[in-house]
């Protein structure tokens, strides 16, 4: 699913229902003004109610402990979410819900709603820009295998009933010292940094940072293109709207 401009939607702009063998790639989309008629949803939303999933969390924990092969039985190949510009004002920019597993999420510009990962396994979230928001980990398993690394984060993590912090939550770049200290108190982010984050021209949609900034030199963040989101043709570009840039 590539180079679409999707906006003014009652629910998600793109929704993935169950793993369906994985291997899906969602890239270079411009998705905003979503979730206009409900809540508890995301601009890119997913459900992972695969064969290991159970509505009772304790039973699901038992199933995955006893039969770990079930975790990737339905999402064999990773699902990739990359190079998208996303904004949700009534939910999350990315919402991986209900067991969503085996995801690679990188180089996304999240303009408002942050990234939520509910219970699931093997989600790698790296090198994303999370403007005015943060990571929302909900009900993580002790052995989730999740990775959250080298992301620009602006507010405190918002965990709910987290039983473990995945394989690696570290090497992130915090724009707020209190958010950084709160993350350290949770036991992770030992190698993360707190620094001033100065975007090139946020008002015009350029959220890259200077190559000599600490975000890059110490944090390891890698800039990615800011001009490839959405439709490609000149005709469609003239028709397509653009999201409001955050302040």
Task: Please state what every model-predicted region is.
Residues 12-19, 38-49, 67-74, 92-99, ...:
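Glycine-rich beta-solenoid repeat tracts in large extracellular/virion proteins
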Residues 42-43, 47-57, 144-247:
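Acidic, glycine- and Ser/Thr-rich low-complexity intrinsically disordered tracts
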Residues 63-66, 70, 220:
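Carbohydrate-interacting regions of secretory-pathway proteins
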Residues 33, 70, 204:
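Generic anion/oxyanion-binding catalytic loop in active/binding sites
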Residues 1-12, 21-36, 50-63, 75-88, ...:
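Right-handed parallel beta-helix
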């Amino acid at each position: 699913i590539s180079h679409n401009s999707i906006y003014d939607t009652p629910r998600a702009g793109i929704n993935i229902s169950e793993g369906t063998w994985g291997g899906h790639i969602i890239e270079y989309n411009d998705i905003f003004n979503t979730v206009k008629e409900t809540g508890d949803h995301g601009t890119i939303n997913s459900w992972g109610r695969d064969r290991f999933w159970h509505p009772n969390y304790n039973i699901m924990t038992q199933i995955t402990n006893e039969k770990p092969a079930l975790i990737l039985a339905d999402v064999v190949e990773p699902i990739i979410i990359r190079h998208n510009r996303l904004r949700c004002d009534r939910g999350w920019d990315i919402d991986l819900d209900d067991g969503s597993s085996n995801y690679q999420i990188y180089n996304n510009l999240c303009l408002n709603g942050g990234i939520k990962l509910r219970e699931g396994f093997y989600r790698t979230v790296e090198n994303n820009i999370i403007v005015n928001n943060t990571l929302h980990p909900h009900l993580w398993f002790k052995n989730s295998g999740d990775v959250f690394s080298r992301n620009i984060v602006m507010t405190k993590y918002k965990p709910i009933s987290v039983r473990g912090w995945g394989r690696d939550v570290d090497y992130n770049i915090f724009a707020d010292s209190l958010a950084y200290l709160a993350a350290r108190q949770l036991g992770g982010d030992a190698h993360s940094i707190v620094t001033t984050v100065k975007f090139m021209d946020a008002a015009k949609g350029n959220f890259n940072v200077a190559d000599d900034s600490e975000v890059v030199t110490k944090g390891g963040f890698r800039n990615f293109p800011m001009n490839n989101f959405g439709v490609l043709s000149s005709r469609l570009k003239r028709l397509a709207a653009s999201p409001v840039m955050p302040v």
